[in-house]
Amino acid sequence: MIESIVGIDLGTTNSEIAIYRGARPEVLMDELGRKILPSVVGVGETGDLLVGEDARNQLILYPERTIKSIKRQMGSNDKVHLAGCEYTPQEISAIILKRLKHIAEQSLGQPVRKAVITVPAYFSDTQRQATREAGEIAGLEVVRIINEPTAAALVYEAAQHQGKRILVYDLGGGTFDASIVRIEAGVVEVISSHGNNHLGGDDFDHKIVEHIIDHLRIKQGVDVSDQPKAMARILRSAEAAKKHLSDHPYARIEEEYLTETAGKPTHLVLELSREEYEGMIAPFIEETLAAIHVALESASLTSSQIDEILLVGGATRTPLIRRRLREAFAREARGEVDPDLCVALGAAIQGGAIAGAEVSAVLVDVTPYTFGTSALGELNGEFYPYQYVPIIPKNTAIPVHKSDVFFTVTDDQNTVEVRVYQGENADALENIQIGEFRVEGLSKAPAGNPIILDLALDRDGILNVSAKEKNTGLERRITIDRAMSRYDKDELHDARQRITDLFGAEDADQMPGSSSGTTGAPTDGPVATLVAKAQAKLDEAVDEDRAELIDLVEIIRDCQRRSDLTGLDVARKQLTDLLFYLET
């Protein structure tokens, strides 16, 4: 029996969970037959936890104890308050993930412990790690994080879009990504990606909200901008108007008894035309077109070389988007797969592939950033101590492992400082510093002592960095995700317990690597020795390496149970390579 690995689209506005079964992906429904879970969390009047539609419904009356669009804050140090308690964005996202997990378990009739989760292609390492942490807090082993446009392209590939170059235009509630994807011979390859992780349908809503506030101020002399409950009702009306204007030229916005001023009620009655609305959001659409051109340039393509345009994300239902894309590319964009569901469907396809199901595509993902370090060099023709030296260029296929050599600058130099940056600017200080460490105790040697800097980027965008003195083997290494992480292991455990307490007692989920009875341990001599060697490395391995060790051991055990000799041989070779890497 193939292991169930669910696919999750953890969205800014809505989230979905899907599974690959019966040779196709399907989005799972809750007990009321709903496929879409609003990404909203709240606490009811009696202190009960609300997730999804119930939380969204109370947002109008109780905005102070309801949280939405938490995805915008993923990877930040922000804290949010809910019912007198303080939570991180990871914890709020974990509540949503835990609800999705429950929906899947009820639908499938079996425990769900592993998931593929999607993120915007332009999410930073910090945001990707925060997503992984949210999954761990929710009791899920996140076996893969993939880009949302990649997942969507995979769904369309299943519809036999072979041998084409495709633009995936992904505009969700809070993020935008333009990805150029090549589909050929059953392989989905992301050539380039560019976007903005703070641009989406929420911005469209806020433009309508601003219009409504101005209308009330000018026509009725009332300012409700400092009244949370009134603002929540206005936001809900703005969202409804936006959706209505996708299919109609006008939207009527009405809210009775919105507020009271000097004892008199204020009623909102306003008609908004599509033309007015499109004028409000046109600058945002132009931003997305500019991002598309950056992605095209990175892929060394012109607009005429694009064969298909695929629309992803609920905000793409806005007619202006289709019109501007048609003007720019002289072709119609396609959106026949529900743009709200296709990302979750693609995640489920990837989950099925990882679990061993036969699917038609192999994902080749790329990094949306350049990763590098700083060194003495030149900038604009002048000596500069912080010249940016790229090591992993933007749009490199991942996973990737690259090294470069640097040299000490003084005789008997004892220490080197390594700074790791993310960005494209030739001035390292203009890029984002994502980690730093020192290598101390270098051997006494003349200037020019070689230091090898090694960067390994995995499929989840998590970076492992090491610096080694070539002549002695002296080495220091860091994992950037932990350097930027908002949690250490104890905090992860505490956060998971807090979320578990909110949900109440459930079946005891096993965290990855924990004991769960019969393990099906390999008994074949060479394989058993290899597995034992891997298990001995678990304590000293960094978290990402430890997770990969656990994954490969599990795959080996599963292949032995199923007598899958081909799969066993592949996993054995991968584990051998990983152990070799860890020992060098």
Task: Walk through the language-model features, giving the residues of each.
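Oxyanion-binding/catalytic loops of NTP- or PPi-dependent enzymes
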Residues: 1-76, 80-86, 95, 102-584
